[in-house]
């Protein structure tokens, strides 16, 4: 892996109130109060930077070994330094702010790799927590001991990054902190590089992470100068692909290009023009937008992430009559749905097209709405209750669909998403009994283009709904999440937003019928 040619951090001295203990390795400790500068061979103020280095190849640094990660960071960012902080993994979080303010590199631990890195950096002074046994790491260097719990550490050497330094960005995952994060932050600040936070290690998570990715992109070639800390970022190839998506692909309502976990959704369910199928059709499109936004707002106080309003539009409606095509499903014209899709896009509302196909297969019906599914804010739901075999009839039997048909439809939608450079699509499977998806274990649910959910459609008493939920959440295929439906009339009583979000696991998608 190509590295950044290290830089020199020129050091000056800074007077600060407080206490520091100056210890020359091999000598007794001496506590000095009101010290102007610790005596010893440290470089004085007025130092100048060496030539600026080139940016390193972008890399993902493992965050599990804090010591190894700190060595990798300093070796990438610094050529030499007059002073360095050496901390234990336990003390590092307390010292990170001080290290950043002082502009000092930070190393974690005192093992052989750290000793070797200290020899390369050639500092005259080591700053460490009081009582730290530096062992061979101290060498003949001056040691300044500080109390990590103190409000200030007294007079410490300070560094400054060269003005002509290479553009480097350090990426941190705030939702999955690693032991290496404190030193990563300290070393980035000491080197004058930016720290960008990307939840879940994914620049596509939300609007803030996309903005951070664009800030990194402004530096130039994404193949250089990006150091990501932690396993959540995946491989460097995965991170590079995600960065490319974050900076080039349209965003979902609420920001970002992956549906979850950067948001949750609350949807009005139904079909335009009729109140018989759900609340969505009880008003016109503008009224539905207003109502859905009000529903989502009721969930916001109970959510750990933003709640986005959504429509779940029954686009093909199960019918008791065979109809002209004999499939017991009435397909709404795409242009009728388009009015709602257009209005939803303008209002920041996500749309899921729900299929009740009768005797037609799901893929055939989905392809009828291909142009709508090419829109960035439109996903798909397969309602297996209404998927009939040739001799079955609605309301006489509960329909079902096998994994092969689900996978065929999902493959097509994933390809459509990929070929049209679209953000991830929500892909919903309705279910209230195991018979509806009889071989669910064979469904491939981890396609990166799709966020696949099982939508628990059970209604009735609290015990009945939770019984359905607890059954359906068992043995989910890898990559499949959970969704929930609240019924105004059939539930006794209707669950409140707080009660709904107290369910385990908390549903990503909630619809109202």
Task: For the regions a language model picked out, list residue spans one by one.
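Bacterial signal peptide processing site
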Residues: 39-42
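Structural preference for beta-strand elements that scaffold enzyme active sites
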Residues: 263-267, 306-312, 348-352, 377-381, ...
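C-terminal motif of bacterial Sec signal peptides marking the signal peptidase cleavage site
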Residues: 33-37
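N-terminal export and membrane-targeting signals
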Residues: 2-29
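Extracellular glycan-binding segments that recognize GlcNAc-based cell-wall polysaccharides
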Residues: 44-255
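Surface-exposed substrate-engagement region within the catalytic domains
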Residues: 171-174, 201, 205-215, 396-512
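Chitinase-like catalytic core of GlcNAc-active glycosidases
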Residues: 303-349, 359-375, 379-381, 388, ...
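Catalytic domains of carbohydrate-active enzymes, especially glycoside hydrolases
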Residues: 190-194, 250-314, 343
């Amino acid at each position: 892996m190509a590295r950044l040619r290290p830089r020199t951090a020129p050091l000056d001295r800074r007077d600060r109130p407080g206490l520091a203990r100056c210890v020359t390795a091999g000598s007794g400790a001496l506590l000095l109060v009101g010290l102007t500068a610790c005596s010893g061979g440290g470089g004085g103020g007025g130092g100048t930077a060496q030539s600026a280095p080139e940016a390193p190849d972008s890399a993902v640094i493992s965050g599990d070994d804090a010591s190894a990660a700190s060595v990798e960071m300093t070796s990438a960012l610094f050529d030499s330094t007059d002073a360095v902080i050496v901390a234990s993994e336990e003390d590092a979080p307390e010292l990170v702010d001080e290290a950043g303010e002082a502009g000092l590199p930070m190393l974690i631990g005192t093992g052989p790799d750290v000793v070797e890195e200290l020899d390369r950096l050639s500092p005259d002074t080591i700053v460490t927590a009081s009582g730290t046994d530096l062992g061979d790491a101290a060498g003949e260097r001056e040691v300044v001991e500080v109390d990590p719990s103190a409000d200030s550490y007294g007079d410490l050497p300070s560094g400054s990054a060269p003005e002509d330094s290479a553009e480097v960005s350090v990426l941190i995952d705030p939702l999955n902190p690693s032991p290496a994060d404190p030193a990563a932050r300290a070393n980035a600040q000491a080197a004058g590089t930016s720290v960008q936070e990307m939840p879940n290690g994914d620049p596509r998570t939300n609007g803030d992470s996309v903005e951070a990715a664009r800030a990194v992109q402004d530096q130039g070639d994404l193949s250089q100068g990006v150091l990501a800390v932690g396993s959540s970022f995946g491989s460097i190839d995965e991170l590079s692909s995600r960065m490319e998506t974050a900076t080039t692909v349209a965003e979902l309502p609420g920001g970002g290009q992956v549906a979850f976990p950067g948001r949750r959704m609350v949807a009005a369910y139904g079909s335009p023009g009729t109140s018989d199928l759900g609340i969505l059709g009880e008003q016109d499109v503008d009224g539905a937008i207003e109502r859905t936004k009000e529903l989502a707002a009721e969930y916001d106080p109970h959510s750990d992430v933003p709640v986005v309003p959504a429509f779940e539009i029954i686009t093909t409606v199960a019918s008791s009559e065979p109809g002209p095509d004999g499939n017991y499903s009435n397909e709404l014209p795409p242009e009728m749905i388009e009015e709602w899709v257009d209005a939803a896009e303008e209002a920041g509302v996500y749309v899921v097209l729900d299929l009740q196909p009768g005797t037609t297969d799901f893929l055939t019906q989905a392809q009828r709405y291909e142009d709508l599914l090419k829109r960035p804010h439109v996903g798909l739901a397969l309602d297996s209750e209404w998927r009939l075999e040739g001799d079955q009839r609605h309301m006489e039997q509960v329909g079902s669909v096998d994994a092969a048909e689900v996978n065929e439809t999902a493959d097509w939608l994933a390809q459509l998403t990929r070929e049209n450079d679209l953000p991830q699509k929500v892909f919903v499977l309705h279910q209230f009994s195991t018979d509806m998806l009889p071989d669910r274990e064979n469904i491939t649910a981890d396609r990166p283009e799709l966020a696949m959910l099982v939508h628990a459609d059970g209604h009735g008493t609290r015990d009945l709904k939770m019984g359905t939920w607890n059954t359906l959440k068992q043995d989910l295929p890898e990559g499949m999440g959970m969704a929930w439906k609240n019924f105004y009339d059939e539930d006794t009583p209707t669950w409140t937003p707080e009660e709904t979000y107290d369910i385990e696991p908390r549903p990503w998608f909630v619809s109202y019928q």
